[in-house]
């Protein structure tokens, strides 16, 4: 398992969590990940889980990283006026079965820790951001089984 993050504190937290869950010996944690590194995982069954706050539009490009064609990916998308969900998923249509999953509203009544709060505070506690961040679920048509 590989994890990458540009934030040193996040890398340290990842290592602590891996240790607490008994998987520290199965994870490598490094800093920034370059598109050329995808080639390292060719020939292996690979699932890429990615939430990189908009950088997915640059990093995850099959034209730059042909290895992506055989990987399955789950990517949180951060579209804006310059980057659309359709633009991102279109680049994978030849190599992947593409599914876009829209986030759903969460019920604050399901979380006991929120029940003592006023209703508006409960609602705000569950809002991560103002804009929806859908997931792209990309299943390779050529994945290694």
Tell me what each language-model feature is:
Residues 8-9, 55, 79-80, 142-144:
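Short, solvent-exposed loop/turn segments at secondary-structure junctions
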Residues 81-145:
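Rossmann-like AdoMet/SAM-dependent catalytic core
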Residues 2-4, 30, 74, 99:
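Hydrophobic/aromatic beta-strand patches that form the interior of the parallel beta-sheet core
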Residues 41-42, 62-70, 91-93:
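Short, conserved loop/helix-junction motifs that constitute active-site signature segments
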Residues 4-57:
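S-adenosyl-L-methionine
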Residues 69-80:
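Conserved beta-strand signature within the Rossmann-like core of class I S-adenosyl-L-methionine
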Residues 54-64, 84-85:
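A short, conserved alpha-helix within the catalytic core of class I
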